[in-house]
Curated annotation (Swiss-Prot):
This is Small ribosomal subunit protein uS17. NCBIfam families: PRK05610.1, uS17_bact. InterPro entries: NA-bd_OB-fold, Ribosomal_uS17, Ribosomal_uS17_bact/chlr, Ribosomal_uS17_CS. One of the primary rRNA binding proteins, it binds specifically to the 5'-end of 16S ribosomal RNA. Part of the 30S ribosomal subunit. It comes from Chlamydia trachomatis serovar D (strain ATCC VR-885 / DSM 19411 / UW-3/Cx). Keywords: Ribonucleoprotein, Ribosomal protein, RNA-binding, rRNA-binding. GO terms for cellular component: cytosolic small ribosomal subunit. The gene is rpsQ.
């Protein structure tokens, strides 16, 4: 029932680049796509602040999920590690 109420939340997979804050990590998500006009393969990355209760470390590959705003910049939470 709870999953119906929350709806479908966005998920992303990325690498933890910083874990120096308490219960917060910075996750870099890379996206590779072909440019629509020039057909060149482009690599783009974004950094997300995510709530960390699983004690993940720098260099870990993790899955993050969209959640309610937890602070000024945190809108994601770590769901689990990806191996």
């Amino acid at each position: 029932m709870a999953s119906d109420v929350r709806g479908r939340r966005k998920t992303k997979i990325g690498v933890v680049v910083s874990s120096k804050m308490e219960k917060t990590v910075v996750v870099r998500v890379e996206r590779v796509y072909s440019h629509p006009q020039y057909a060149k393969v482009v690599r783009d990355s974004s950094k997300y602040y995510a709530h960390n209760e699983l004690d993940v470390k720098e260099g870990d590959t993790v899955r993050i999920q969209e959640t309610r705003p937890l602070s000024k910049t945190k809108r994601w939470r770590v769901v689990g590690r990806v191996n």
